[in-house]
């Protein structure tokens, strides 16, 4: 099928739906593929088990998520004065089924009933906006949960948040989680496919909860509240270390090693 001198690298992010056409195409081109790169070890293991590509062709290659110079410039911007000194948690992502923000809205309904005075800021736009707005009103959370829409610069929000929630049903491994870790902000993430558990080292570098399980999410948040500052600092250090694997420079070095 291919008669080229160029080395062909197939990048796989997450676990794509393997319909007949995709399987058929992958099997045809598999012999001509130089490498298959996966964004996490979890995805690499899953792709290897399919038996379509030679195991020695499948590697993990961290995505180039962090542009350090851009990051350092953007994080210097001050947060809107109306939002400063607020006790808030943060969620960033498109308002879609995948991101599952309704789980967080329901969580903050529980917190309100417990008289815990915290806010949730949700940054992003998408097809679930009307649904989420209606849910916020239905649960009487208009003074607790706020849809802020799209923001060009999210870093001032990240660095000032108590923690970042990642409630996704699936990721690989999750750009916002990595950006938060680079900002030294703690992450509370769903244990979804593929990658959050790996990045957060099964809780060593953050907090994990069972995917789409509000009871488990509440337990993780309670753990966040109850852990001492030294333990939280330790988690931040491990997460920051892991986030450095996702800089553009780290990606360049890894690619250079692979290609050469």
Pin down the residues of each PLM region:
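A conserved, positively charged/aromatic
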Residues: 8-34, 52-53
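A conserved mid-protein helix/loop that constitutes part of the nucleotide-sugar donor-binding site
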Residues: 87-113, 120, 127-133, 175
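Aromatic "clamp/platform" in nucleotide-sugar-dependent glycosyltransferases that forms part
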Residues: 150, 169
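Conserved acidic donor-binding segment of nucleotide-sugar-dependent glycosyltransferases
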Residues: 202-203, 207-214, 222-229
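A short, well-ordered alpha-helix in the C-terminal region of glycosyltransferases
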Residues: 230-245
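A short, active-site helix/loop in glycosyltransferases that binds the activated sugar's phosphate group
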Residues: 33-58, 65, 69
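Short hydrophobic beta-strand element within catalytic cores of glycosyltransferases
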Residues: 186-190
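Acidic anion/phosphate-binding donor-loop and adjacent secondary structure
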Residues: 48-49, 64-82, 156
């Amino acid at each position: 099928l291919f008669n080229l001198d160029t080395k062909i690298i197939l990048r796989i992010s997450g676990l794509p739906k393997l319909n007949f056409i995709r399987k058929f195409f992958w099997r045809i081109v598999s012999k001509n593929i130089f490498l298959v790169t996966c964004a996490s070890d979890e995805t690499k293991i899953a792709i290897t088990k399919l038996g379509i590509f030679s195991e020695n062709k499948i590697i993990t290659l961290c995505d180039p998520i962090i542009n350090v110079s851009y990051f350092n410039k953007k994080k210097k911007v001050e947060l809107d004065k109306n939002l400063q000194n607020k006790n808030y948690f943060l969620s960033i992502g498109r308002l879609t089924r995948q991101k599952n923000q309704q789980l967080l809205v329901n969580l903050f309904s529980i917190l309100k009933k417990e008289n815990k005075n915290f806010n949730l800021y949700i940054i992003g736009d998408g097809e679930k906006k009307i649904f989420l707005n209606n849910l916020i009103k239905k649960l009487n959370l208009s003074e607790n949960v706020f849809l802020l829409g799209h923001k060009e610069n999210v870093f001032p929000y990240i660095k000032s948040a108590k923690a970042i929630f990642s409630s996704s049903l699936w990721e690989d491994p999750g750009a916002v989680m990595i950006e938060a870790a680079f900002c030294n902000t703690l992450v509370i993430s769903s244990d979804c496919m593929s990658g959050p558990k790996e990045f957060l080292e099964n809780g060593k570098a953050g907090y994990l909860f069972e995917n789409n399980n509000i009871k488990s999410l509440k337990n993780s948040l309670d753990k966040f509240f109850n852990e001492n500052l030294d333990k939280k600092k330790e988690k931040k250090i491990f997460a920051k270390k892991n986030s450095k694997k996702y800089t553009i420079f780290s990606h360049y070095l890894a690619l250079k090693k692979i290609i050469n």
